[in-house]
């Protein structure tokens, strides 16, 4: 629990920014963040953030949601380590464009996977 206490303090010390995240400002906005939880709705925004942080913030690990649209089984949502510093949570294939919409139960399951992976990373566990 000592790791969590230190991380909570770190989170409280962060500044809030009300800005649009761009490739230009993302490295500054997320500088010094050991873990970033990506939760954008739009695929292009997700890609921009993930690609920018992987390229410019070598000490940052990203936990991203991908594939949670529709009313399919929540049991298809999982967490996988895609790259050394990138974890993907979701089913990896469903999309709002094909499924029509997001459903809050599947979004909640995916968010739970993201939160769990982030806690595991804080505790030093790197495998999903």
Q: Model-flagged regions — what are they?
A:
Residues 12, 23, 126:
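A Rossmann-like FAD-binding core segment of flavoenzymes
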Residues 29-35, 39-128:
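Glycine-rich phosphate/adenylate-binding loop
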Residues 18-26:
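Conserved SAM/SAH-binding loop
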Residues 14-16:
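Hydrophobic/aromatic anchor residues within beta-strands of the central parallel beta-sheet
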